[in-house]
Amino acid sequence: MPRKPTPEEIETAMLALVTERGAGKNLDPTEVARVVGGDKPDEWGPLMGLVRQVAVRLMKQGRIVILRKGRPADPDDFRGIYRLTLPPSPEA
């Protein structure tokens, strides 16, 4: 049985992936779970709750944005399918 990734490992992967994707592009949170957990659904699927918790914390810190239906979501109250992206640059 593979070991469970830490929140710090998930954060590192999440920030790397959204940065790699670049401004104006977004990321499916399952991609983060797959990077840290593995390609099989029974490996990455159980990590989705922790991925969401890390995403909420990073959004509250202003380091990423959680999108729901293409718009920034309330980190304390969103449901369903969501995406991750970089916050707008200060020059924008």
Residue locations for each model-derived region?
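Short, positively charged loop/turn segments that connect secondary-structure elements
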Residues: 37-53
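An alpha-helix initiation/capping motif
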Residues: 8, 30, 49-52
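A short, conserved structural fragment
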Residues: 62-68
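Long, charged, low-complexity intrinsically disordered regions
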Residues: 3-7, 88-90
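Positively charged, polyanion-binding regions of nucleic-acid-associated proteins
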Residues: 5-26
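Basic amphipathic alpha-helical segments that dock to polyanions
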Residues: 57-58
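Short acidic, hydrophobic short linear motifs in intrinsically disordered regions
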Residues: 24-35
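Short, cationic-aromatic polyanion-contact patches
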Residues: 69-92
